[in-house]
Each structure stands twice: as structure tokens, then as C-alpha cells.
Amino acid sequence: RDQPRSRGLGDVYKRQMVQSVAAVPCGVTDYRQNLFKQTPYDAETSAAVIDIMEEFGDECKRRHGKRIIYPSDEWYLKAGRPIPEPEFYEDYDQLENGVGMMSLFREEFLAELEKPHRIYGTKKMDVVTGTMAAPLITEMMDELRRQYPMIEVKVHPIKNNFFGGNVGVAGLVTATDIIAQCEGRLSSGTLGVPAVMLREEKDTFLDDMTVSYTHLRAH
């Protein structure tokens, strides 16, 4: 544990004024010409980061009653490890940085399914998401279909060719990739898009196409 990053985390839990710290893997795109070399994290190195973060988080919990240090969801997905339960994230202080987002989504989605809903007729819908979140979204849609057989949801994992590299988060998926990969494959008249794919308070993707235009082009 003599690496600088480990020593840095050790300094964090000695300072009680720090509310929370998140670790997020660097997204390596195809647009890194003339920049320093950045090797993407793989399953093994991601697991090592999780072990370090959880160890220091446990120590913070013992010292201060709060974990303070959190790995983002991406580390668990890259390492092939289960996303922690909601209790792990406490107050979700780092939710905007992708820490606990998947755990919270799963918890809220399943809680909503427990409520009674009246649904008439068959409902069809297409949903797009990033490659990282696709397994969880598919799992939740399967659970939805199990409880409500009249609802059909087709999940489309979108590979990020726009930015390339190892980018797999839903928030960086563009309309360009959605159109290219979904054209002729949509099975309904409704397209579900995660809010994180859109510009803040706007109905446009990062490449400035609107949701309605994207749906029209992809259908």
C-alpha cells in the first residue's frame, strides 16, 4: 500500500471535513492523438481498485461512521462483480458521478413494480442504453415482463462508435450511433431514452439531434 493513490486515500479518512470521495475510471476514447498514453482498466485492475477503495471505505466507516470513499459503478461492471446493495451507498452523496446509480435504479424499479398497476392491452416499447448498463436494464425489463406479460420491451445496447475506445456509459451515447445500430430493428412506436443521454434541460443528444428526430430516422 505504498502507492501514491493509496497514501492519498489514507490522508482522506484522517480529515473529517471531507464529506465524500469517488473514484471513476478514465474513459479512453479514440481521440487521443499526441496525448500521453492511457491504458484502459481491465477486469483484473478494476478489481484491484475496488479492493483498495472498499478497504479504505471500511476504515472510514469504523472511524467516522460513514464510508466516505466510494468506487463508481463502472469499476464493478468492468471487474464483473455484483453492484453493492443500496445500504453500501448510504446517502448517495456521489450519485451524479455514477456512484450507486445502478443500485438505486434497481431498488426504485423493483419498488415500483410492487405497486398495483392497471394496464390495458399490449404495450410495446424499445429502449436504448449503453453497453455497460445493458445487462441490468435487460434484467429489469425481464422482471417487468414476468409481472406484466402484456408489456413487451426490447433493449438495444448501443456500442459507442462515436467516441470509440472503451467508452460504454449511457451518458455518452449519441444519436448517430443509435440511428446506425437501430435502423430497421425497432419494433414499436415508442423509444425509451435514459435522461443521462440528453443535454441538461434539453431534448437533444450530445451530437445535437433531438429524440423525436432520432426515433424517426431509426424507425
What residues fall within each predicted segment?
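Auxiliary Fe-S-binding modules of radical SAM enzymes
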Residues: 17-22, 27-217
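Single conserved hydrophobic/aromatic residue that forms the stacking wall/gate
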Residues: 2-13, 215-218
